[in-house]
Each structure stands twice: as structure tokens, then as C-alpha cells.
Regions:
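C-terminal motif of bacterial Sec signal peptides marking the signal peptidase cleavage site
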Residues: 15-18
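Acidic/polar, low-complexity intrinsically disordered N-terminal segments immediately downstream
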Residues: 20-177, 181, 401-407
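Ser/Thr/Gly/Pro-rich, low-complexity flexible regions
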Residues: 144-407
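Intrinsically disordered, low-complexity regions enriched in Ser/Pro/Gly/Gln/His and often acidic
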Residues: 9-12, 299
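Positively charged n-region of N-terminal signal peptides that target proteins for export
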Residues: 1-6, 10
Length: 407
């Protein structure tokens, strides 16, 4: 997280220094070029639109310039960019391209690829940062409905007059995240909101009854799967100034043989209950990182490194932690619920969302709300959320998700 702040601050400083109107572009400092993903940072092979990536130079140039792009880590040749060379027209400092699937269904397991700037057309131009990491996953699998589920769905149509199949399978959504005033600089490049298009896989929950329809999002719930993984990494393995400086964190990562490109992170959301008035219940009473009962969005996380940590803890494994020149041995079972753990729930969605736990003025808190409108063909959610176990955000982030139903 602190590295993220430093990176943004450095690039902002370069922009400020480079923007003096009285300085000739032929005499200016190095023109740094940075790549950032717009919205989601993961997609499945069957998604045609891929991921949009923005490129920004520190200052405008008085002629057309370009950068050549290179993809690293794509061992299966599963993706491509829509442009090999990205052109910045004279007088502009932004351009964009897309990372696209080759639509060949080549992956059996996910891969993490990186798009970097390979070369620049002008000697003043210099790549800034490490490029953009994008996770490419195998084609999404839609769970088949059982005979019992089909019977329930038919019953809802007859008795309630609703067709649940309009919101099941792969459903498109638009996600808008609003950041608090004190958080937008560090977490959203100074912008108030971040909007992206997502897709979720939705099915009928095992909790559904003949009287009450209940949905389960089994893939990319709320369109936020890759965003959740992004912020989880930023407050753990990508936080070089705190998490990664803790000896216990280093010991745990070594013990579980953490390897980012090979790790998987999946999220589901069960218990979305449709009421007869069209409202949706989707919150639940859960424990926070301190063991207190609070209201949360019951996202369920499956993180491969955390699964290994739990297994090793159950087997009685220990780790050796360097404590200032001396070595101490700890049971992994004692580290499952403290800072340094790889448990996603320790860092994600920490605060109570039934009331405003931050108490800021103005506040970014919003009362959780869900509703469905079959006439308009939309399903909508609004809720507050946070991350970082209280050490990173100054307020909630405010999330608004709108699903478009099938015809």
C-alpha cells in the first residue's frame, strides 16, 4: 500500500514538473510512460472484450511518438494486444489498447501475464513502473441446474410470476466504486469513482425453498472478483513497507511456498434472498477479525496459499521467525488469525456495515440495499465495504452494482 502511494506520488510529481507551459518539450526531462489497467484486471478466455489498458506520458510532445508493447508470461499464447505499437498523437499524452483473448480455449489453469513497454520511439521517453499484470482464466463453467432446481424455478414462475432464468447463467453488470475524500488519492489515482464492466455466474442456491427464491453467485460475485484480489494483494504481499517487512509474514510465505503467478483466488456469494416486494437480502451476521459479530457481505474466499496454510496448521507444522537476531518457533495454528496470516477474511470486508463504523463527516457510508425490477430488467445492489483490517482506509468505499437481465 505504501509503495502504491509512493508510485502515484512520484508519477504525479513528474506530471507537475513536466507541465510548465514555458518549457520547450525539446529541452524537458525524461518523458516517463506508465501503463494502468482500466477496471477489471482478470478475464476468462471466452470473454471477447478483454481488458482495457491506459497509457499516460508525463508531458505532451510536439510530434507523434509511439511505444512498442510486449506480453510476458503467456506460455500458451492465449492472449494478444489489439495494437503492437501504441501511438501518442502530437499534443496528447494518453492512449489506450486492449488485451484480448485469442479465443482458442487453450488454458487448463489460469496464467498471470504482464504487458510491458518494450521500446520507445523517442530517446526522451522512458517506461515507468513494471507494466500491468492481468490474470487470464480458463473458460467460465456454468453449473447445470438439477431437476429439483428446475422444478423450483418453474414454481416461482407459476406462483410468483417471476422468471429467475433471466438473471441466471452469465450476467453482465456495471460496478461503480466511490472512494472517500481521504482515500481516493492513494487508492484511485485521485479520482472520486472507479467504474468497470463485469460478469458474474449466477445460479439457484441450495438454500432456496418452494416459498423463497435464493440466488448464489458462483463466479465473480458483484463483478468484483479481480478487484477484491487486487486490494487483498495490496494490503498483504504487495505491501512492501509493512506486511512484507514483518518477519512472521516472510516466514509464512516461505513455509507455504507462495508463488504469485501460480496462486488462485476465487470468490462466491451465497444467500441472496428475493423478497416478495422485490427487495433483496444479501448481508449476514459474521465474525470480524477480532471475533465480534458484525453485519457483512458474506463473500466466501478460496485462496490457494491460505488453503495450504490451513492444511499445514492442521498437520501441526511450525515456522521459524527471525526476531532481531534470534529465532523463535511458532505453530502455524497460532498464526491463522493475526496479522501475517494469509486468511482473506482477516483483511477484507472488516467493518460492520449495519451502521457507520467510521463516523466521518462527510461520510462515505451508505445503507446496504438490494432490489430487483423484472419490468426494467435490472437487479441492483448498493453497499459499503472496506479492507485492510483498519490500517489502510479512512472510510468505507461505496459500491453500486447494476445487473442487466437476459431478455
Amino acid at each position: 500500500m505504501r509503495n502504491l502511494k509512493i508510485t502515484i506520488a512520484l508519477f504525479s510529481l513528474m506530471l507537475w514538473v513536466a507541465c510548465g507551459e514555458n518549457v520547450d518539450t525539446t529541452e524537458r526531462m525524461s518523458n516517463y510512460v506508465m501503463l494502468t489497467a482500466k477496471g477489471e484486471t482478470s478475464f476468462t478466455e471466452d470473454v471477447a472484450e478483454g481488458i482495457e489498458v491506459n497509457a499516460m506520458m508525463a508531458y505532451r510532445m510536439d510530434k507523434d511518438v509511439s511505444v512498442r508493447l510486449r506480453i510476458e508470461g503467456d506460455d500458451k499464447n492465449a492472449v494478444k494486444t489489439d495494437k503492437d505499437t501504441l501511438v501518442f498523437k502530437a499534443g496528447t499524452k494518453t492512449a489506450s489498447f486492449r488485451v484480448l483473448s485469442n479465443q482458442k480455449s487453450l488454458l487448463a489453469v489460469q496464467e498471470v501475464i504482464r504487458v510491458v513497454i518494450d521500446s520507445c520511439s523517442d530517446p526522451k521517453m522512458t517506461p515507468f513502473g513494471n507494466g500491468v499484470n492481468i490474470t487470464v482464466k480458463p473458460n467460465a463453467e456454468i453449473p447445470p441446474l438439477t431437476d429439483e432446481q428446475l422444478k423450483l424455478i418453474a414454481g416461482y414462475k407459476d406462483q410468483l410470476g417471476i422468471d429467475l432464468t433471466r438473471m441466471m447463467g452469465v450476467s453482465n453488470c456495471t460496478v461503480t466504486i466511490k472512494f472517500g475524500n481521504d482515500d481516493k488519492e492513494a487508492w484511485n489515482e485521485g479520482k472520486d469513482t472507479r467504474t468497470f464492466i463485469g460478469k458474474s455466474i449466477i445460479t439457484l442456491s441450495d438454500k432456496a425453498t418452494a416459498e423463497t427464491p435464493v440466488l448464489k453467485m458462483v463466479g465473480n460475485p458483484m463483478g468484483m472478483g479481480s478487484y477484491i484480489y487486487e486490494v487483498f494483494r495490496k494490503v498483504t504481499t504487495e505491501d512492501k513497507d509493512f506486511f512484507m517487512q514483518m518477519p512472521v509474514s516472510a516466514a509464512v510465505l516461505q513455509a507455504v511456498a507462495y508463488d504469485y503467478p501460480k496462486e488462485t483466488f476465487n470468490v462466491t456469494l451465497d444467500g441472496i434472498t428475493l423478497n416478495r416486494d422485490g427487495t433483496l437480502n444479501f448481508t449476514s451476521q459474521m465474525e470480524d477479525e477480532y471475533g465480534d459479530e458484525v453485519t457483512k457481505i458474506p463473500f466466501d474466499y478460496k485462496f490457494s496459499a491460505w488453503e495450504r496454510m490451513k492444511k499445514m496448521a492442521a498437520e501441526g507444522k511450525t515456522v521459524e521467525v527471525d526476531e532481531g537476531g534470534t529465532t523463535a518457533e511458532y505453530a502455524l495454528s497460532d498464526l491463522l488469525q493475526q496479522i501475517g496470516t494469509l486468511n482473506p477474511t482477516y483483511y477484507l470486508g472488516n467493518s460492520n456495515i449495519a451502521t457507520d463504523a467510521y463516523g466521518n463527516e462527510p461520510s462515505n457510508y451508505v445503507t446496504p440495499m438490494g432490489k430487483v425490477d423484472f419490468k426494467a430488467g435490472v437487479m441492483e445492489f448498493v453497499f459499503p465495504w472496506d479492507f485492510g483490517a483498519g490500517g489502510f482506509l479512512s472510510d468505507y468505499i461505496n459500491i453500486h452494482v447494476v445487473y442487466t437481465m437476459h431478455p
